[in-house]
């Protein structure tokens, strides 16, 4: 046995075999661990690709952000009141603290947004409506906008001004949903959804934004559907409810954790009676609240729009404000803070109360008209002014905060209008409730039972009605149910909200639609049922008939002419100008790429192109080159729609490969028509071989370059090297406006080609549909277009002739 061992140990082949066996065992062990690792990774990727993981992560993240904003904002307001109380007794220092504190915060918020991301200013819901509809708005869903919106909104809310959190936070949640989706796609290796297919993700983000803003999961889903979507996919229902419920739960748990609340309760605690919440005799008062809220809501939207339109007009004041962006928020902040100074004019309309304190005081169960000693009412005591009636105080609060809120939300800071309007509605409802308590001091008697009137109930109903009138949403009633924890007032609240919507929708668009109209965002207005003329309008009446198209027989000179004559982003692609049969649609950047690749400086020297490329490879790769002829930058092709050309370079690598040709050398701009005015030779888009190529360019005269380019421009284009959309959306001339509106809304279209038996006869875009709808709304009556009248008359004559021939045939 020992002999065999010694023989084996002395045998190099045996030793080599044992070494290989050991290495094989190590490799086997490594391969096992690698297989386990790959299995775990695949499982992780599969889990991260699930919808519920995405929803839970998004809900937890948004709840944390919302809680952090509320926590910092509440501490900021406490510090504000602490500073004001420290200098009590010195009126001058009190005024200085009261004005300077919000002034510093508002200016910081405005400046921060201007530097980081100007798209963070305002509400964000109008822009989201257009994005969900299919429009592309750049930089609205980026990380920079998220940072600017979050920081700016937190600082602005700490100022104690009538500014809301709901609209901006919906925008923040949508940004988080987009960024989180991109991150999970990167981790799991999935292809990210196209820009126009992210409506479901953005809708869920909107629902989560409302849910963790107020802790209202049900209302969050419903409100997001009403406000942001014209058509909602039922498949997103469970996503919205799951994410909303989880985010609202985490948001409330965090509040309990920091001991802001004792347990999971409603955001605004109320103690209304639950056995008999209201009497039928109170329904007329609730209806009055709804009708009045409708009028005041429409007036608020009108006033807000007039302020914005005035600031956009060109005059001496607006010129100064546009040059110095911080002057406008500084002036508005100074004026509002001065008027709200508690020892001054502000003492007459409860300006010392912060927004949340105001809502809590308006929702209390006490009847102020019956209160003799207000010192035991807490914050509600600030509504009692010596020698001043409580109704006058509430009326002053409503009037002053009405125009203050309409003015404050126009400042260039992240802000919304939901909470200020909510306060206004609560004051209006409280006013009616106190008036009812004054008219019926002993309560209402019905069937031998006595029902006492609680003005706090009227305040809740007024808050829901006013916000519904401004936003044109009925789900504000559900928001109030979840905010107050009171569901016993379903009937009166729904009556008030529906009446408010009926009145407001007949007078003004919603606040978000008003901003869309002012900013001229690509969005379709709603098609009213009351417009009978819409059924007579067809696509042939509103389409653009003079269409610039590109034919399959076009030359490079024709392409250059089309680009110089129009600024369209897409062109219809037809077979020949004579037949005009629609074959597809081609993007502007694709046409630019065809010209850049064809009329190139390297194509002028085909014999020396390879040598130039080889010499350029060995030369300095980092050297830049500019071979532009002086004075010709204006007519250079490189400057035709330069922003779109730069945007095309930022596309995905796959798309860039599709349009690449066999000669991937630096392109040159297209020259001008005259030999004495040539265009630039090179662009600063490629490096390395430019300096070598310039040597060969110096050997050509301007006349030779001009003749060569003229020959190239007469060559028929080969469209096989570019991407063509072979299935653009098409309509026929007889398509009704109603059906066209539905198709554009459902599919997120921005244009459609109109054909007749395959022949291109026109194009209709959002602008034409919007003009047709708005024309049918203005002044309540719209004359049908001339073509429609001619068509209807012709159809009537044809039908008459058909009837005559049928009768004679019989």
UniProtKB/Swiss-Prot annotation:
A motif (Selectivity filter part_3) lies at residues 416-420. Residues 2-48, 507-810 are cytoplasmic. Its main location: membrane. Residues 125-132, 201-213, 217-225, 456-470, 471-472, 473-484, 485-489 dip into the membrane without crossing it. Changing residue 166 to A/Q/V: Gating function is lost. The channel is always open. Signal peptide: none annotated. It is found in: Membrane. The chain crosses the membrane at residues 49-86, 93-116, 141-160, 166-184, 237-254, 283-311, 320-339, 389-408, 416-439, 490-506. A motif (Selectivity filter part_2) lies at residues 164-168. A motif (Selectivity filter part_1) lies at residues 122-126. Keywords: CBS domain, Chloride, Chloride channel, Glycoprotein, Ion channel, Ion transport, Membrane, Repeat, Transmembrane, Transmembrane helix, Transport, Voltage-gated channel. GO terms for cellular component: chloride channel complex; plasma membrane. It comes from the Eukaryota. Belongs to the chloride channel (TC 2.A.49) family. ClC-0 subfamily. The CLC channel family contains both chloride channels and proton-coupled anion transporters that exchange chloride or another anion for protons. The absence of conserved gating glutamate residues is typical for family members that function as channels. This is Chloride channel protein. It comes from Tetronarce californica (Pacific electric ray).
